[in-house]
């Protein structure tokens, strides 16, 4: 029988504050002028906010609902005591924004080198300071367990700590926050576009048009899969520890490194070659690292080490360069329009494709097409 709590968690990732279904992958921004209203805006939670300092409250919530998770950033103006509980089979990762004050979870301080983690159906208490911002990710439990087994090739319980506070290296926390900010910035820019000047509105309209085009081409699922894979990888990296006490069972520490390095040179080259061939065979979509791990039956850490050893770069970096070079060759032979070539190589955001292409080759795709 299907787990009803998993279904509830999955449904909650795609509903807004009013309970209405929203398009997965489309950012949503809400503003509250009451602490209880702010608490209600977070769908999929049981929670109560008590305002502990005088003054008019203002809270904002920027969220990105996805198929298997919800990513959000919450900002609150006043000191709050929050009684919280995520519903269903899901896990909440709470990463405070640096420089905005420390919060407490169940009376324990969460400092700059740590983040909070709580499973669903477990009540906890947060005490947050004034002018506070926090990134949150709520992920379905079945998704985390599948990722641990199929991509990390590790036991989920060994990878994800059970304590409410998880220590992590500053580099890993900064990388995770930068990733979440990059995804949520789209929401902020779209809101500014709706309320800003003509150029802002035109920019927002272009982004929405690109999204609509992606949906018509059936690529939105691939885009969401890429985002979710990036977030999952960053979360598991952060859970690996602060570098001193990383858990070998989740690929961290000296023992984990030794297992990965035991792969022979020929085996590493074979893994890289197989990854390249698989990406080229599925060039019309952006194949991610998790998919490669499942296809090649290797862990993400092993794949990372093989690419670093053979090519001197991360797998995602090389695979993007591989697709960009393929697009460059097609443009130089006038194999189609810029949009056609981009789509043929799995680039569905034209503006991002143009920026990546120019960064790689020093010219825009349209310039390469005209010069051919």
At which residue positions do the language-model features occur?
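Alpha-helical bundle regulatory/interaction domains
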Residues: 2-56, 103-283, 288-290, 294-300, ...
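Long amphipathic N-terminal alpha/beta scaffold segment
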Residues: 48-84
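Short, conserved glycine- and acidic-residue-centered signature motifs
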Residues: 86, 268, 320
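Short, basic-rich loop-to-helix N-cap that marks the start of a DNA-contacting helix
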Residues: 317
